């Protein structure tokens, strides 16, 4: 009983330790504390076995020991004391207990109580001096913060004396001394030209890390001046990156912090040459990060930092390759990051002196030539990236032959003239984990990957077991077959990208042996045939599978498929046939992207698809699917895009759709019938219903806040345009063309935004999923080969613009695609009548307006001159009258202008864009004159038949149609009244008229039977 009780107490004490403290113990002294603890427990158990004659009872000693265990656990958890620090003495006490002698125990008990209180005394919160200093810092920070953000300034920092400042946000303390050792201040909305008074930091004498990414403009200290940071003698890390607007004026302050080992000035908009001389006193500096600025050479003074091990100059504008001569003198460098600069020319030979270098990133520059032969001296090199440079000609890997530690190699060229030397004499000593060779006109896989094989096109020997984990040879010219034994040769492969090449033939069945592979992209090749059974059953670790744009055939994923972990599946643009079977996808809750578009699938849309609860993108467009749309399919909660267009679907539209964050719904080119539900626009961002057989009127839509593209072209919609359309405040593209709408154009359409003020919103559907995978980790390269699964779905929007019905694409990963700038309204080919509302001229962001092929009358509103961004204006095939407003010549963006086949008259305006329009824009308007027509506005009409032989000037003024109609009606009425008056008097004319009438009546009667 007693044994069980004490063991139970021991377990409870162990579980009382906080996970963070346990992790800290493991990091500093892994295994030591626990080994000692287990040893003491074993010692205690041995003493029990040796005392078999002693009857074990639940004595006061055992109870006190248990209480001590609890106290030890609580104090250790609260104060940051390691578990061994208190448990071991107490376990020692229990293991040495003489269960027969209470006095001896009490003596030891008193001793351990004293020691326990001593441990408790060592557990300290923050000291009062630093607590007051933190409150002063907060007060100062509030004084330089914008008033709107004052509530967000260190809300947990308060003046409550019972509050432990070591528990405040942005603070880290030493658990033993209670002194502040880290202060982190993130991005803040500070007032303009805000300076930090460094003297406020002086009370933090043991601070080791300062992170001030807060939008500051500089430092100030009216007492200590530039030497202010020298008072922080323990300061090792100073991070001033991001959101700061520092310039070189802060460098004298920084130079005083001679204890610094790490300095980051990343992303501070610093320009021009960096004065390394001004930080020459930082002789202990090991890491210097100046990335994401606008710095350029020279680099003189860098050699003062002799202990520097990591240098990051990426994302700047360094250009001269000769500037690297200074870097070559930094022989203690471990990591050098020079990517995304403007270095031009060949790599200098002196880089071979950096024999301690582990990481070298030269990507995204303008380097050319080849690798220097001196690279064979970089014996410590593990990571080399030469992506996105301007290499041309033959590129040799021979300088890398002896680099036994090389794990990561990346190469690509912005030029299409680079060719890889795939065969060479030296035998390469490295075993790469990551290979990226893109856009290199590669026709063969390099020999260092294939080793001792026959060097035909991409063949591998059966005996190779390569340690390669990441292989990217996409966007090359490799043709032929994948080797049959690729799965045996690369069994450890985790990710492979062979997209955009010219591979042919079947997919090798040996790929089923790649049981560890998680990402496979073979899209945009010429593969054919069925998917091998071993492949669909063996690669059970696959999460991302892209086989798009090939010629695979057969049934889509048989029932025995083992792709149970799939998150992204793209098999679009192939030749898969048959129905969409049940398979194992029916129970997959991790699948996020499923694209089966552009195949030959038949049958109904299976109802089990609604069980794919994690689905965000579903595209089954351009197949031969029939039946109705399952309502449950559109109710999936996370669905953001569904494309069922280009099928043979029938039935009615669903009344509403799901999607927590807005859905893009493409149902065009089907055979859907019936009315459009008034609730359909709820939570819908894009609705494409073009070319169906929908009928009825435009409904009184409810909840229209989300919709910004509405396309209903080519249906059988009737009735007038609903004024509810005026509530589409966020609309960008509105297409109601090719229907049977009638009535007037609502003047309230000027309420439509056609270009929202919030430019951050975008049309695209981009679901970017990051799958962490540490292929390589260093100071600057952390999870460098994290594969970002760009699960975006390109959206195709067809809209009439510039006399063409074109496709516009969006939904790239970024929000600057073409759809973000497309604002248009198409009401053409309907039966609309009446005047064109002048209020439409208020749609200043509109780029396309098409009102052609209607029955619109009156004149062209002069307010259209306010359409500053208009590119295409089509008013053809109406009954418009009057002249073309001269103000329209101010439309500098106008490319297409069509007013053909109307009743317009007068002089055609000239100037600016109107000088570019040809005669086709004005056909069918006989009363228009001037260029580009052949009708002169100054033509004279002569009369050779006049009696006096004189000439009368022909009036070429435009016909006033209103006056013409009025005079014609007056003449008609006057004639009728005159005839009526004549009939009222007895005169020869009246009698003659009556005789004619009588004769006509008699003639008609004689003709009747």
Swiss-Prot record:
**Cellular component terms (Gene Ontology):** plasma membrane
Among InterPro entries, the record links this protein to: Leu-rich_rpt (IPR001611), Leu-rich_rpt_typical-subtyp (IPR003591), LRR_dom_sf (IPR032675), LRR_N_plant-typ (IPR013210), RLP_Defense_Trigger (IPR051502)
Source superkingdom:
Eukaryota
Q: Can the keyword Nuclease be found in this entry's annotation?
A: no
Residues bearing glycans:
159, 197, 267, 390, 402, 497, 516, 526, 551, 588, 611, 716, 751, 850, 890, 903, 934
Compositionally biased residues, Acidic residues: 945-955
One Pfam family in the UniProt entry? LRR_8
The record ties this protein, via SUPFAM superfamilies, to: L domain-like
- Keyword Transcription in record: no
Where would I find the LRR repeats?
204-231, 232-255, 257-281, 282-305, 306-329, 331-354, 355-377, 379-402, 404-427, 442-465, 466-490, 492-514, 515-538, 540-565, 567-587, 588-612, 613-636, 638-660, 662-681, 682-705, 707-728, 729-752, 819-842, 843-866, 867-891, 893-916
* UniProt entry keywords in alphabetical sequence: Cell membrane, Glycoprotein, Leucine-rich repeat, Membrane, Receptor, Repeat, Signal, Transmembrane, Transmembrane helix
User: In what way does this protein cross or attach to the membrane?
Assistant: Single-pass type I membrane protein
Residues assigned to the Cytoplasmic compartment are 983-1009
Segments spanning the bilayer are: 962-982
What family is this? Belongs to the RLP family.
Q: What is this protein called?
A: Putative receptor-like protein 8
Tell me what organism the protein belongs to.
Arabidopsis thaliana
Organism lineage: Eukaryota, Viridiplantae, Streptophyta, Embryophyta, Tracheophyta
